[in-house]
């Protein structure tokens, strides 16, 4: 936890240090690898952190500070349970390993606020509203069962844009957020990837 605070403070100091040395953005697009920590219903099914995710995000700036856009993610997690005897219906039982899989697809409109629009390293906070699709799969040999649901989604996020050079359109994007959904498909997520900006 101490290390996380140290990194966060260092990033904020860096953003302040470059306060007037960056370009204003008119558009920004990011492409990220996403990892997530399941909460609520997903954590009851598979409690471990998932590392198989992707994210695409874009925003159009209506002022120097404010962008309106959208965010799309896909997350996949899997767990293998050691072999044991399972009852698959009347008079039918199998001894096999059990494979659990979850798939989460959040889609949201997003409002983004840049705290330092002319800074070199740009720090932002965002809020999203939308919907999420969540599916749980269980497979035992050739038998497969699934449970799917849709839910209304609310999602706060914080992040930074770090360009590869003073006049570079490309850079690194790091973000963290929380997905809350009415179908109880909650998770904490972490994005690491690339962004492309239009000045």
What positions do the PLM features span?
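Cleavable N-terminal export/targeting peptides
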Residues: 1-26
